[in-house]
């Protein structure tokens, strides 16, 4: 099993979705989707007298955004970067309250947020999507702080993060290594 910690407002999570679903299908394993509110870093602005640390943070943030945009363009996705600034806590809490294979729900929710620009925190929308995916909501109240605290105790600090056989993989760059682990007789 792949445990995937995601945040719907994270473009990196959205870009990791299709490769993770393909990995799971190829390796005949399930994905357990778990909520984790990522900390969106604001793009620092250049100042006249910035320190080396400030320069590093600014250049790194700019590089991350260019790389995300590059991969979005390769998939012919027209991405509005402002979608990454929206709070998706209600949708994450809803996900945590569902029972069953939530992969279709997660896929549709990411598309609704990033492509269709839908308010994914809207309870009516979430109820309809849950029904359309054949899922059941078993918990109407979820403590995201508690879920995140437990994840952080395991070493998690951002999304997307994936757990396979107790090993943690931060970011989508590790998907080839995850494939190697799963195909070498690992967890199925």
What is the meaning of each model-derived region?
Residues 12-112:
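Structural alpha/beta surface segment adjacent to cysteine/selenocysteine redox centers
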Residues 3, 7-34, 100, 104, ...:
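C-terminal cap of thioredoxin/glutaredoxin-like
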């Amino acid at each position: 099993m792949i445990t995937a910690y995601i945040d719907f407002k994270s473009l990196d999570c959205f870009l990791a979705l299709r490769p993770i679903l393909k990995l799971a299908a190829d390796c005949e394993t399930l994905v357990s989707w778990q909520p984790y509110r990522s900390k969106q870093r604001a793009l620092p602005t250049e100042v006249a007298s910035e320190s080396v640390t400030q320069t590093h943070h600014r250049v790194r943030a700019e590089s991350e955004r260019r790389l995300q945009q590059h991969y979005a363009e390769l998939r012919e996705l027209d991405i509005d970067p402002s979608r990454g600034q929206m709070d998706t806590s209600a949708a994450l809490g809803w996900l945590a309250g569902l029972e069953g294979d939530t992969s279709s729900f997660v896929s549709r929710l990411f598309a609704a947020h990033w492509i269709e620009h839908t308010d994914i925190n809207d309870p009516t929308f979430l109820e309809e999507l849950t029904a359309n995916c054949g899922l059941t909501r078993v918990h109407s109240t979820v403590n995201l702080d508690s879920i995140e605290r437990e994840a952080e105790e395991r070493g998690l600090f951002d999304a997307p993060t994936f757990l396979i056989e107790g090993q943690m993989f931060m970011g989508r760059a590790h998907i080839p290594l995850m494939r190697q682990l799963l195909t070498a007789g690992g967890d199925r």
